[in-house]
């Protein structure tokens, strides 16, 4: 009696468990569907944007798309044509205005330049003064050349005495048939010439009196004994003659020892 009751109870328990599971499953599904139904998308979310684009792609037919593309191309063409016309018009107007402005500027520059050049001219450097040559006097007497006899007598008198007194000059000019001014000027020129000659002789003597050292070479290196290079060459010195050149020999105004 106990054996048949056991399996019957187990089967009833299994059925009750399966019913409870089935009853729970639809509740869960309904809960999920309700949650999904309650879920809303924002208008700017990625899902909403993707959903709109997909709907538009599905709704638009190829014929409508072709028409829209053609209409868009026509609009673009007309836009660019109008824009090109406007750009050409604006360029022409701009070029005209630039030409007018350039003409006005050139006129203004010319006027300002003329005004500035007329009123503010650059300072001119003073030209160098021309070299003024000494001109002879118009009333100057012609130069009278001296004769040879007059020149000889003048040279002889100058060697005797370089400066003449008034009486001597008057007497000497009468003897040569010359004026006192001619004799006076000749003596002045002759003294200047004698001074120039004396200075030139002094310069020549100074140049000649400078010692001229001839280059020489040492027979052996410095610091080395002379015995290595042989005995030095000895030359006999001349013996001075007694009685000769005891006193200084004078040549003019200088003495040689």
From Swiss-Prot:
Localization annotation: Nucleus
Keyword set, alphabetical order: Developmental protein, DNA-binding, Homeobox, Nucleus
Pfam families: Homeodomain
Amino acid composition bias (Basic and acidic residues), ranges on this chain: 12-35
Binding region for DNA: 139-198
Keyword Acyltransferase attributed: no
One GO cellular component, as annotated: nucleus
PANTHER family: HOMEOBOX PROTEIN MSX, HOMEOBOX PROTEIN MSX-3
Role of this protein: Probable morphogenetic role.
Official protein name in the record: Homeobox protein MSH-B
Provenance organism: Danio rerio (Zebrafish)
Gene from which this protein is expressed: msxb
């Amino acid at each position: 009696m106990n054996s048949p009751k056991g399996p019957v109870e187990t089967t009833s328990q299994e059925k009750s468990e399966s019913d409870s599971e089935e009853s729970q499953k639809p509740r869960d599904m309904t809960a999920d569907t309700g949650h999904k139904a309650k879920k809303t998308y924002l208008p700017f979310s990625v899902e909403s944007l993707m959903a709109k684009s997909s709907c538009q792609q599905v709704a638009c037919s190829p014929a409508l798309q072709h028409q829209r593309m053609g209409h868009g191309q026509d609009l673009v063409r007309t836009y660019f044509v109008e824009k090109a016309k406007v750009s050409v018009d604006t360029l022409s107007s701009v070029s005209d205005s630039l030409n007018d402005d350039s003409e006005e500027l050139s006129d203004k520059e010319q006027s300002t330049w003329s005004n500035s050049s007329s009123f503010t001219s650059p300072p001119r450097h003073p030209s160098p003064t021309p070299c003024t040559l000494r001109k002879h006097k118009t009333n100057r007497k012609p130069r009278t050349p001296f004769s040879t006899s007059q020149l000889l007598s003048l040279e002889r008198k100058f060697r005797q005495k370089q400066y003449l007194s008034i009486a001597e000059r008057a007497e000497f000019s009468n003897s040569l048939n010359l004026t006192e001014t001619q004799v006076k000027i000749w003596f002045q020129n002759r003294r200047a010439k004698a001074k120039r000659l004396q200075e030139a002789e002094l310069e020549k003597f100074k140049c000649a009196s400078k010692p001229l050292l001839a280059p020489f070479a040492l027979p052996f290196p410095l610091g080395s004994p002379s015995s290595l290079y042989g005995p030095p060459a000895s030359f006999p010195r001349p013996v001075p003659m007694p009685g000769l050149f005891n006193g200084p020999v004078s040549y003019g105004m200088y003495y040689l020892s």
